[in-house]
């Protein structure tokens, strides 16, 4: 028979819902033998043996403390019970200051000891005043640790009475001791003095605090321990420490304990029976009822065996009136068995075999001729593999080392199982001869929802009561025998859905888990979906890491508990002790020989052959990654992915990454494992390059695994290339050039020919759609021909690579740690674009939904062809933004300028800018370039300012992955717009943007194309038409230069119009949308304007500075005639 698992007896949960048991609630702790049950709340159904309240003692108690009947005082104004008195005469009662204020007109004539200053001040007092609030915040709180400890010694015999009984494992005993009686009366009298007013803001206690609490039965004040506080902070569960009973109390009836009150120890001693533990994890109802009758209303003598929990919990044995000790009685009646620990020591853990033996005795008493259900053995557990990661919900929680989860993906399976169980049990009648043996599986009816679930019989607490564990949810309860039904073989086919887990990497700070740790972890994982990753197995449970959130917002629960000092890092040797002990018994073997790691890259033919390539990662024409063929080795990569998963799931060893060495990396996007090369170590994270695809990524060290030589046999599929024969038209590749190049090569089959080879990759000539990519870049004026194109014959990348092709794989290159450079390793060259921060114009803007109409919030304007709006829909992920800000600050503080790289930015490029107010670095977009200062708009907030050139730095590509709050836009109809914009037209465009409505027409690959409509009060016209009219008027007065005009001409320069305050903080985007009046001329055209020049040339076919479209002339002529007609009509009128 399988080993019997005895979890705490709590009710099961419905499928995929919150646990039925909670920390800090009665059912959370099976109080019998656990020392940490002190002051954790009374069990449901507990009753006081003396009285229902702390201050009303039963007359049957023999020590003679009888509380006099309280005198009721009623408010002189409203008639309600009141505890305040007039400060003048000290006689007239009131319930509040408000009632005293209202009654003062009548009462002042009879108030003999009237003091005008005293009463006047009293009338002005209000609980809502700032002084009262400040005093309540500065109150000195008192906790249990501040009270004196009980001074009874071990072996002492104490006479008294049990005043509150929950179970033999938890009851409260009040000693018949004159000192205790004196302390109790002193505490009660002190608590009734000058209680705080109930009007105004109530005092909010904290969990674990000892307060003065007004008892609901007699409305007197007593010392109470705050055990739990409701989420809305309106009620608290309170344990009256001097009497042992508990209740839920509104916070209005709780006030801080007077610090002048003497710190007496709790008068009621919390006790548990010594030397015995229950048959199962909690005491049966029958046992509690029997013992309660033996203890209630009697004077008893207890013997103190031990003191636990910092002197708060006492292990005792009681001499019963029947002449037996309580422990002896419990053993004889079969309610408990003897504890294995020696007398005087802490209770030991229960032996499952002893539990099973005691249970079997109850089972065998009436099993003759019964159906004991021996065939129904528990189903197999779910198959789990190390490295698996999946979403779960927590169905039952006890502590970080004992909780149950269910897979979210199995929710439908569980629901279907419940329907089948309901149908099965509704057709099966109660069978009197059904008595399933412990360890077998049957159907059990859950007491809360009366539904049927699969359950394993754990034990027989009595002849007719059975403890069952719900195998699909993890929790358990005690049920009557007639609430069980036989199960069918079909219902046992599904594996157990409950997964028993232990949080990996943590251990208690002390001997057991603290309540703060348990409640904190439960708040993090209860009622939500979390991700778990299987790391190992320990004692039949899964060691898991719990990850909350996704991507950059991931939170490791274990790390959070450690950082909050709720847990300590686990000693890895502890969990491996069993395995090491077993291994030590075997004869020592020689250490395995580590096979060196060798790898290679796919090579491109260097003899002038033409090959088909497809891009996998594109940064710029100077750096992109390709794979040979559109689907090269696709099937091989799929098979490799399976092998990588199997390897990483079975490899649980700690991996130390080294720069220049390959490894396995889990990609957060799909959770799959890929081959990668370690590029850079950044503390707790690592920058890697996916060698089969070319992408760079920063991942945590927990996402890395070692790699084997077998997994490196397939050459790395991504080949690093650059476009040969061209170089940027300016100092760097413009944003338009980057976007144009990406759109041309992404997803296309490219014909490539290698013209040069280096350690950094291949220089290639590309053809896309029958045209040369380099020639197209030059014709679009995005690039210019390179003057240093190599004319030498094509050579192979390295001599060592030739050896690789001709020799055996065993002669391949070893990792960089062995002083040998890998063939395809990029190295850490400062010229590598992916490693060097740049003023990149290739940042991708968010796409707005098509045909959506909204009122735009303008962030910055360069011209009608290029302006920036705040995203109308997108919500900024503040956590991810903070992570980017931290990394940005680290980058800027460590940035070192390189003289070999021309870092002069261009308008529209992304950068790092230091805000002038708080001196913090932010992501920004350059609007205007000057010699001493630049105009920027802060990309995550929308405000803009001019900053010195020294406060502008290039930005790494990885910091551009999080989308900006601002979006790049262009006005619809831009194909008819000029290259250079007159300042007057730009000023009109800026002024007309107020209160316009925008409609998204398309996305042209780099910007959102918007149609802007003026408000009805301004005519409701399309803003593009207004701009066209203004351009026409300007052309007639001052013709625009054509595209062939030289850069040195005196043409009107483009203007950069900025909308936004120059002093608003990036943290306050709402205040950053005030338009500025300054219009500053730049000294050179932007790349965007150069592209518009080419477009305008192709559309209009300009032949001279005064030429324009014939259709536009006709439209303007008709407009002039209409204006003349209107003027003539007005003149006649």
Curated annotation (Swiss-Prot):
Give the SMART domains listed for this entry: TUDOR (SM00333)
The reply to whether Disulfide bond figures as a keyword in the UniProt entry is no
GO cellular component assignments? P granule; pi-body
InterPro entries (alphabetical)? SNase_OB-fold_sf, Tudor, Tudor_domain_containing, Tudor_TDRD1_rpt1, Tudor_TDRD1_rpt2, Tudor_TDRD1_rpt3, Znf_MYND
How would you summarize where this protein is expressed among tissues? Answer: Expressed in both the ovary and testis in the adult. Present in migrating primordial germ cells (PGCs) and also in the germ cells in both the gonadal primordia (stage 33), and in the developing ovary and testis.
**ZnF (MYND-type) intervals:** 75-111
**A Gene Ontology molecular function term of the record:** zinc ion binding
The record's subcellular locations are: Cytoplasm
Show where the Tudor domain sits. 204-264, 435-494, 656-714, 904-962
Xref: Pfam families: TUDOR (PF00567), zf-MYND (PF01753)
Q: In which broad location class does this protein mainly occur, judging by the first location in its UniProt entry?
A: cytoplasm
Q: Where is this region: Disordered?
A: 1-55, 786-836, 1036-1104
User: Where along the chain is composition biased (Low complexity)?
Assistant: 37-46
Q: How does it assemble?
A: Interacts with MAEL. Interacts with PIWIL1, PIWIL2 and PIWIL4 (when methylated on arginine residues).
Q: Which family does it belong to?
A: Belongs to the TDRD1 family.
User: What is this protein called in UniProt?
Assistant: Tudor domain-containing protein 1
Q: Which gene encodes it?
A: tdrd1
């Amino acid at each position: 028979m399988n080993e019997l698992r005895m979890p705490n007896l709590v009710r099961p949960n419905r499928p995929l819902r919150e646990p039925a048991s909670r920390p800090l609630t009665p059912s959370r702790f099976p109080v019998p033998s656990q020392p940490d049950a002190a002051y954790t709340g009374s069990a449901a159904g507990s009753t006081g043996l003396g009285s229902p309240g702390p201050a009303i003692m039963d007359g049957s108690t023999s020590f003679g403390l009888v509380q006099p009947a309280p005198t009721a005082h009623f408010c002189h104004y409203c008639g309600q019970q009141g505890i305040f008195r007039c400060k003048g005469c000290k006689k007239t009662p009131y319930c509040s200051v408000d009632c005293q204020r209202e009654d003062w007109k009548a009462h002042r004539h009879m108030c003999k000891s009237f003091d005008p200053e005293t009463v006047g001040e009293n009338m002005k007092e209000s609980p809502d005043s700032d002084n009262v609030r400040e005093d309540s915040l500065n109150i000195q709180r008192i906790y249990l640790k501040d009270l004196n400890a009980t001074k009874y010694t071990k072996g002492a015999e104490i006479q008294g009475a049990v005043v509150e009984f929950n179970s033999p494992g938890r009851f409260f005993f009040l000693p018949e001791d004159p000192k205790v009686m004196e302390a109790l009366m002193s505490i009660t009298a002190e608590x009734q003095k000058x209680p705080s007013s109930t009007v105004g803001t109530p005092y909010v206690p904290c969990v674990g605090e000892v307060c003065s609490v007004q008892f609901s039965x007699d409305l007197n004040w007593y010392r109470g321990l705050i055990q739990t506080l409701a989420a809305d902070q309106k009620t608290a569960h309170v344990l009256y420490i001097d009497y042992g009973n508990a209740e839920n109390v509104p916070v209005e009836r709780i006030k801080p304990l007077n610090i002048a009150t003497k710190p007496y120890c709790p008068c009621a001693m919390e006790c548990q029976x010594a030397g015995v533990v229950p048959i199962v994890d909690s005491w049966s109802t029958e046992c509690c009822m029997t013992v309660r009758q033996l203890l209630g209303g009697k004077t008893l003598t207890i013997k103190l065996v031990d003191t636990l929990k910092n002197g708060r919990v006492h292990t005792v044995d009681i001499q019963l009136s029947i002449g037996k000790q309580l422990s002896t009685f419990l053993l004889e009646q079969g309610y408990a068995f003897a504890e294995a620990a020696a007398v005087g020591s802490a209770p030991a853990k229960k032996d499952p075999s002893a539990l099973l033996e005691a249970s079997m005795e109850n089972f065998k008493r009436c099993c003759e001729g019964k159906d004991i259900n021996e065939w129904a053995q528990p189903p197999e557990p779910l198959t789990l593999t190390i490295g698996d990661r999946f979403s779960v919900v927590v169905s039952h929680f006890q502590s970080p080392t004992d909780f149950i989860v269910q897979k979210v993906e199995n929710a439908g399976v569980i629901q279907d199982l419940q329907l089948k169980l309901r149908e099965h049990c509704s057709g099966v009648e109660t069978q009197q001869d059904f008595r399933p043996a412990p360890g077998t599986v049957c159907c059990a009816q859950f007491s809360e929802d009366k539904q049927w679930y699969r359950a394993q019989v754990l034990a027989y607490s009595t002849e007719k009561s059975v403890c069952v564990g719900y195998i699909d949810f993890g929790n358990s309860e005690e049920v009557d025998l007639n609430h069980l039904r036989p199960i069918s073989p079909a219902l046992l086919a599904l594996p157990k859905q409950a997964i028993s887990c232990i949080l990996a990497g943590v251990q208690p700070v002390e001997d057991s888990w603290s309540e703060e740790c348990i409640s904190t972890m439960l708040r993090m994982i209860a009622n939500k979906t979390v991700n778990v990753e299987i790391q190992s197995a320990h004692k039949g449970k899964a060691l898991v890491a719990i990850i909350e959130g996704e991507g950059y917002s991931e939170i490791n629960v274990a790390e959070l508990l450690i950082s909050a000092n709720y847990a300590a890092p686990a000693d890895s040797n502890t969990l491996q002790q069993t395995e090491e002990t077993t291994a030590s018994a075997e004869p020592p073997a020689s250490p395995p020989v580590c096979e060196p790691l060798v790898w290679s890259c796919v090579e491109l033919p260097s003899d002038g052959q033409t090959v088909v390539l497809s891009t996998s990662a594109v940064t710029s024409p100077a750096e992109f990654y390709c794979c040979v063929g559109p689907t090269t080795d696709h099937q091989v990569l799929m098979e490799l992915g399976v092998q990588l998963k199997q390897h990483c799931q079975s490899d649980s060893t700690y991996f130390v990454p080294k720069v220049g060495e390959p490894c396995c990396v889990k990609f957060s996007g799909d959770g799959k494992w890929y081959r990668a090369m370690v590029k850079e170590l950044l503390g707790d994270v690592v920058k890697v390059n996916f060698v089969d695809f070319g992408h760079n990524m920063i991942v945590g060290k927990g996402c890395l695994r070692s790699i084997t030589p077998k997994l490196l046999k397939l050459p790395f599929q991504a080949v690093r290339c650059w476009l040969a024969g061209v170089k940027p038209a300016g100092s760097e590749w413009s944003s338009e050039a980057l976007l144009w190049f990406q759109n041309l090569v992404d997803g296309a089959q490219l014909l490539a020919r290698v013209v040069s080879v280096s350690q950094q990759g291949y220089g290639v000539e590309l053809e896309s759609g029958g045209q040369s990519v380099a020639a197209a870049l030059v014709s679009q004026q995005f690039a210019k021909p390179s003057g240093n194109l190599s004319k030498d014959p094509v050579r192979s990348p390295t001599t060592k690579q030739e050896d690789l092709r001709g020799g055996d794989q065993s002669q391949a290159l070893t990792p960089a740690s062995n002083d040998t450079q890998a063939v395809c390793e990029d190295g850490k060259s400062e010229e590598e674009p992916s490693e060097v921060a740049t003023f990149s114009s290739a940042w991708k803007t968010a796409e707005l939904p098509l045909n959506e109409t909204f009122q735009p919030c303008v962030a910055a304007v360069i011209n009608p062809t290029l302006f920036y709006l705040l995203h109308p829909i997108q919500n900024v992920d503040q956590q991810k933004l903070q992570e980017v800000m931290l990394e940005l600050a680290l980058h800027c503080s460590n940035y070192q300028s390189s003289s070999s790289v021309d870092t002069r930015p261009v308008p529209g490029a992304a950068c790092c800018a230091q805000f002038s107010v708080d001196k913090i670095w932010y992501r920004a977009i350059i609007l205007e370039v000057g010699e001493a200062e630049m105009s920027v708009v802060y990309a995550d907030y929308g405000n803009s300012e001019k900053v010195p050139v020294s406060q502008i730095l290039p930005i790494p590509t990885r910091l551009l992955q999080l989308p900006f709050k601002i979006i790049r836009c262009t006005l619809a109809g831009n194909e008819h717009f000029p290259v250079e914009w007159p300042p007057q037209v730009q000023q009109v465009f800026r002024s007309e943007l107020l209160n316009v409505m925008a409609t998204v027409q398309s996305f042209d690959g780099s910007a959102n194309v918007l149609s802007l409509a003026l408000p009805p009060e301004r005519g409701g016209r399309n803003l593009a038409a207004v701009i066209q009219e203004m351009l026409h008027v300007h052309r007639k007065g001052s013709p625009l230069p054509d595209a062939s005009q030289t850069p040195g001409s005196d043409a009107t320069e483009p203007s950069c119009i900025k909308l936004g305050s120059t002093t608003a903080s990036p943290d306050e985007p709402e205040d950053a949308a005030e338009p500025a009046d300054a219009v500053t001329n730049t000294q050179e055209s932007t790349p965007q304007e150069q592209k518009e020049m080419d477009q305008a040339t192709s559309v209009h076919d300009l032949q001279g500075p005064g030429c324009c479209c014939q259709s536009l002339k006709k439209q303007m002529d008709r407009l002039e005639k209409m204006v003349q007609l209107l003027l003539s009509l007005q003149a006649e009128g």
